[in-house]
Amino acid sequence: MDKTDIKSMNLEELEEFLLSIGEKAFRGKQVFQWIHQKYINGFDEMTNISKDLRQKLEADTRIYGVKEVEKWVSAIDGTTKYLFELYDGHIIESVLMKYKHGNSVCISSQVGCRMGCRFCASTLDGLTRNLMPSEMLDQIYAFERTTGVRVSNVVIMGTGEPFDNYENVLRFLELITHKEGKNLSQRGITVSTCGLVPRIREFAELETAVNLAISLHAPNDDMRKELMPIANRYSIEQIMEACKYYIMKTNRRVTFEYSLVANVNDKKEHAQMLSGLLSGVLCHVNLIPVNPIEERNYRQSTQQSIQNFKNLLEKNRINVTIRREMGRDIQAACGQLRKKYKANHS
């Protein structure tokens, strides 16, 4: 980065910056609104800002964002998968999903990932770098700029572990919900983690209305260690205690994501174990038919197995849904599109 990342500044920092270059503090709100309400790409678009100030901003700062390089649109439901290029040439993925209740965007928080989950393509090449708040924001802003649709929900479930980029994710949340910016409702945002226990507890301390999702994927530690290396650091018991603390602090339910892998974690006994684990906890289970990955020998559970698993959880009074498969005709596991693009352009 050769210039200051102006899009990642909060309003107070922006006002202080403008004072430091001899401008009035009130200009901060104007600049902030141009960036976070108008989604501009360049300072010359700021029509109510003097040319002199625009030149100062151009000299000292940069509006970092994303550039669309490829996209796939589902003919079935309009789901759109994007590959975005960053300022340094790295590629990330984002998905726009259209529902009756509004438009939802799944964004990435890192370039690559170091968590090593066995069923995820995003982690095959490890972690390259964290995304800046500006780069997370612009995945959403780019959708609104190019499609004209209004995004009402955001899930941080794309490439990367959000709590491994904790400070930048917190700044993203501050900016995306700011009343002088997009002003997105906290309740319309979900952060998904594979289970970084200290961060879950820190997040609980914020007493935010942002939703928390846990990538669980196994009902016991032995199985989870096979699927997710993070389980060697934090046990399911530790995760559950952190989740209960989050629920106590926020009075909000936790979503547990459970990817069903054929003959691995989709049997009746696994559903019973999961039911016991979550009994009495304010939570919701999201069953995910796993996407096959060429490099991993995992297959998707049958529809009957998925339904049986759901039925057993419901019988045990666990709130559960099966994730709707969006854009089946352009389906690819998280990280697969980016991986194929890199292979074709290397």
Place the predicted regions along the sequence by residue.
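Conserved AdoMet/S-adenosylmethionine-binding subsite of the radical SAM
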Residues: 144-153, 158-316, 320-323
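Auxiliary Fe-S-binding modules of radical SAM enzymes
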Residues: 1-92, 244-253, 258-346
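Short linear Ser/Thr-Pro motifs
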Residues: 74, 108-109, 122, 192, ...
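Generic beta-strand structural signal
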Residues: 80, 92, 103-107, 115, ...
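P-loop NTP-binding catalytic core
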Residues: 88-97, 101-102
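Canonical Radical SAM [4Fe-4S] cluster-binding loop centered on the CxxxCxxC motif
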Residues: 98-135
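Conserved alpha-helical substructure of the radical SAM core
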Residues: 123-153
